[in-house]
């Protein structure tokens, strides 16, 4: 159900936006306004409470891992952060668009046959995972209960909601072992359909073997989400080891 913004509609909201920009409401021709949590992130014991942990935990961890990975002239490390994942990815800035495959093809062309180079690559689809909520444990499969601060989550789905397969799962688990990082597995409850990620979309467009992984969160998609402090460090270390193994 769509509800009216707390400030009302039309003029009052536009006047507030115009005033903050030093304009008049008449100067605004069109707008894209998004509300956001104004509170700073807060560490509460062994938990981090903040907005947009889905999916900034993955973006930050991936960037840190790339910076930590050793340079290798034989390999090219790529980090792609897309928009519009929560609304289907069908946009020029989303994973359903052609941007990534075009960029990879152009970059690979400078090092040889693009098709061969891309065929020898592997992809991590990094997106937050649902940790078991203590009040609703029945929403999860009874044998797969990801917990906060117990390591990054490997996501598997027979209906291809996630792109992981036996080969890429093995690569991920070996990377976690090499990094000394605990890891968990999420398989959805058959009675509760799970969401998806851009993993299957990107894997389909690029033809790349892909593994779906992420940090477990509580209260995902709320204005303020919760994750384990240790899990962020675990995720960086696991991704760094994955990059190293791929080189």
Locate predicted features:
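N-terminal hydrophobic/helix-forming segments and targeting peptides
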Residues: 1-247
